[in-house]
Amino acid sequence: MSSIIEVKNFTKKYGDFVAVNNISFSVEEGTIFAFLGPNGAGKSTTINTLCTIFEKTAGSLFIDGKDVTDQKSAVRSAIGVVFQDSTLDAKMSIEENLKMHCVFYNIPKREVEERIQFVLELVDLLAERKKPVGALSGGMKRRVEIARGLIHYPKVLFLDEPTTGLDPQTRAHIWAYIIKLQKEKNITIFLTTHYMEEAEICDKIAIIDGGVIVAHDTPYALKKKYTRDKAYISTNNEVALESLLAQYDLNYLKKDSHYRVEAEQLDRLLMVISEHKAHITNLEIKKGTFNDVFLEITGRRIREGI
């Protein structure tokens, strides 16, 4: 699979302040890529440079083989951008907002109707096309934003916090459309999010902190490297349980009669559970989460940092 985004040795300075420091990463075509980081880490600077809004200090950035510095018009034609804050005209209808965007991209008049129908069908809003944007729910507005970002048929869609402020059901619907775009239209999705269950859906994740890439891999690989599953055991015979944990060389933390045991050595933990089952009053296994990954790497929880 070829890379549609290539960032090599990218640096961005503001005077003496280094916002992004010599980072490199790539995004494969047709994948969903999450770019995470605390506030001030360099995340927005990187995205704005990729979208041709900021100028680089050093390095190279390419989208679909086009240099974001020297081929701005070609890059802008290849990307769609959905910002966190709505930029739709609330007084205009869905259709009118999309037509205005077609004008910005010099889309031939003969193609406008076909494109509007196409993108509104993708987000299930064709029947609502005459409604004013101001009368729409938050979830519907996000779908219009996504439709507008697709009207010029980009190869890469940048989504900045696409589901922030939406209820869980609406968030699930928005993600259904995002996955549909990726799978059916082979559009590359580059997104930021502070919902870790969303990050785990992505094919690859990069975490930036202090202006440098501190992790870049699949969600599975990052969780395997930075988290541990844990068992929480309650017992009516603490002496017997502690003896077994020592026998099988398992570390634990105790609070009252509750024990937290690292589940990394699953075979040994299962032996303890089997031999102690008559005394176990409660048992819970908790999988490592991506919040744990972010905390381990950056020292901050994702909801505090992004």
Segments (PLM) and residue ranges:
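Conserved ABC transporter NBD signature motif
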Residues: 59-67, 74-75
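Catalytic Walker B motif of ABC-type/P-loop ATPase nucleotide-binding domains
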Residues: 157-160
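Conserved ABC ATPase "signature" region
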Residues: 99, 103, 110-128
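Conserved catalytic motifs of ABC-family nucleotide-binding domains
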Residues: 153
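Conserved ABC ATPase signature
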Residues: 132-136
